[in-house]
């Protein structure tokens, strides 16, 4: 039963990485376009700034969930690492509990934010509901909660395999 859950979390993690990666690439394309139109064409496009803000929301919440799962989030493990085994596990459970509370906060208030802004539109994108732009908040919170559950039930995901010594880097030596 836990193996399918782990595989589902692996797939969800990669989905987060792809979504956040695409958002980052698009931000990296939109911002230079805004600079180009403003300073080279002397006619600033109105859409790049709000588009970059929307993509930043996507990048932030999907990227944060993915980083949490891989353990790439900010933490202070030095002092916890100095504790004996039993207190270290207790602190770990407290941390996971606090992460679950944060995830539930994101889901609860994110849904309320989406609901409150659903009928509003963005001036530069009149076809797009403001509520839709805030959907990454509750979705990211739900994904984060699933990753917390995974850590509590199964433990952290295994480290990805490292590149073998005879990998691509060896070809350039």
Residue ranges and their predicted role:
Residues 1-173:
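Alpha-helical transmembrane segments and membrane-interface helix-loop junctions
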């Amino acid at each position: 039963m836990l193996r399918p859950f782990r595989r589902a979390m692996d797939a969800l993690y990669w989905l987060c990485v792809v979504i956040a990666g695409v958002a980052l690439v698009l931000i990296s394309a939109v911002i230079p376009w805004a600079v180009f139109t403003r300073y080279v064409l002397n006619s600033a496009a109105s859409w790049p700034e709000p588009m970059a803000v929307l993509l930043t929301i996507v990048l932030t919440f999907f990227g944060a969930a993915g980083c949490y799962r891989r353990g790439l989030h900010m933490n202070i493990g030095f002092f916890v690492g100095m504790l004996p085994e039993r207190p270290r596990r207790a602190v770990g459970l407290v941390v996971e509990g606090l992460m679950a509370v944060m995830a539930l906060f994101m889901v609860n208030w994110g849904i309320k934010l989406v609901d409150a802004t659903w009928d509003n539109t963005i001036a530069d994108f009149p076809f797009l509901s403001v509520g839709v732009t805030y959907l990454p908040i509750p979705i990211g919170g739900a994904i984060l909660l699933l990753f917390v559950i995974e850590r509590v039930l199964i433990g952290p995901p295994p480290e990805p395999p490292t590149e073998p010594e005879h990998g691509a880097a060896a070809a350039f030596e």
